[in-house]
Amino acid sequence: MKNIRNFSIIAHIDHGKSTLSDRLIQTCGGLSDREMEAQVLDSMDLERERGITIKAQSVTLNYKAKDGETYQLNFIDTPGHVDFSYEVSRSLAACEGALLVVDAGQGVEAQTLANCYTAIEMDLEVVPILNKIDLPAADPERVAEEIEDIVGIDAMEAVRCSAKTGVGIEDVLEEIVAKIPAPEGDPNAPLQALIIDSWFDNYLGVVSLVRIKNGVLRKGDKIKVMSTGQTYNVDRLGIFTPKQEDTTVLECGEVGWVVCAIKDILGAPVGDTLTHQHNSATEVLPGFKKVKPQVYAGLFPVSSDDYEAFRDALGKLSLNDASLFYEPETSTALGFGFRCGFLGLLHMEIIQERLEREYDLDLITTAPTVIYEVQLTNGEVVYVDSPAKLPPLNNIAEIREPIAECNMLVPQEYLGNVITLCVEKRGVQTNMVYHGNQIALTYEIPMGEVVLDFFDRLKSTSRGYASLDYGFKRFQAADMVRVDIMINSERVDALALIVHKDNSQYRGRELVEKMRELIPRQQFDIAIQAAIGNHIIARSTVKQLRKNVLAKCYGGDVSRKKKLLQKQKEGKKRMKSLGNVEVPQEAFLAILHVGKDK
């Protein structure tokens, strides 16, 4: 056991985590040169296309160190985006140490900090590593000082390497062996295995990634899931070398995968503890704190026949992604679907793409909203995650919106732009610290504003240099109203949105204009209106298509023309009372882009 090292690789987006993982695998001979490819751990097509890591992946490698011993390294490559930070905290729970990778050109960024603090809170040994020293812009001395100054860990001794060219990778491995402690645990105690991750395999059922904390797990053991009390047989177990390899036993302190022919998706929840059926452990291992979704959106299948398939797909996906929340929802405009909760907009995009690709579904998404706390006049407090569920205005005492605490690291020359952006988003500054050329800004900004397009705009006003990390802080009373969109004086529930009163006129007007461009012309006038309660704040009309009924009267009497026009007018009126308007998919997405084109 003293030769096992469990560690994660944490870093900001694009600081080279996945490339470093590739080099470690190559150096330790996990894959032959023929099987080696770039970002070998990013196995999903989506990850390859976007060049980001979404799911944490684990690998077991054997490394023969300079002291002649052979060490077993279990490491987990983690994502860098804010939206996937729960993946990082889950990975860290299975480790004793973490490699903090910092780009020697870019320096410390917000996510570096956030992930590092998560690791320190969990009492992990953090080993700083300066990556990309082959770049002309690299300045390892400055960055080492920055790490000490901002993060507060000693970085003068930090290993300098270049994951791309392979310089200094040996030193990284030696550093891991020297600095990261061996796992603690008792191989003779009752079995306790923590489920770090699960996914659904069509042939094997549920496959779980586990970390053995105490005891030993063998093939053929009878095991029990502690939260449900269900018992299963261990059919297969093994490790990833990145390929799935079968073994017969997982020793204390190891990380590996287990298949127990669990067919039920809820059979082995992530964060649960596995133990033996007979000599079972009494205590459950501390799991992970449940992540609360920050953004909610309705997902509806385009054709209602896909509803069942959609439900199964969501179930299988939520097994693999513990932070996805969903419940059934019906909408008059879109039929049956689900209200889903996500950690952020990127997470929402990824989930929608995975559903469309892996499960072959066509989906319509409604505009994302955050969750509001509503105090009713009778003293009751309700939580509203969709504009359609907002109680009538006269029953509401006050609406409280969620406030996010945003930590940003900004280079000095972009400070002005970033502050202007934060103020425009109704932000309140709470802190500002200078670290050399970088400035650490802390703002409290309403979650609804952060979620919409804050990240994109922050990147564009600072030319990509500012970085952001945010988390939910509290609910705070605000003057929020619901803007309804009416088409031919019928409310379309899927288009309603909750906005701050100051922005309501502007958002309503803009949305109505957008809808006018997107709704195709019909045989009759279509009135599109935005309303708060019964008060109309904006209107525009999609003009009707009409035939020129006077074409066949050459000259002729004016009363004849009047008669024909009158007849056409009555026909149109009848059509309007019977006709209903098709709202195209683009119109539902228009809400997302309101206010982006300025």
Swiss-Prot record:
It is a peripheral membrane protein. Pfam families: EFG_C, GTP_EFTU, GTP_EFTU_D2, LepA_C. It is found in: Cell inner membrane. The keyword Magnesium does not apply. Coiled coil: none annotated. It catalyses: GTP + H2O = GDP + phosphate + H(+). GO terms for biological process: positive regulation of translation. It is an enzyme of class 3 (hydrolase). This is Elongation factor 4. It comes from Haemophilus influenzae (strain PittEE).
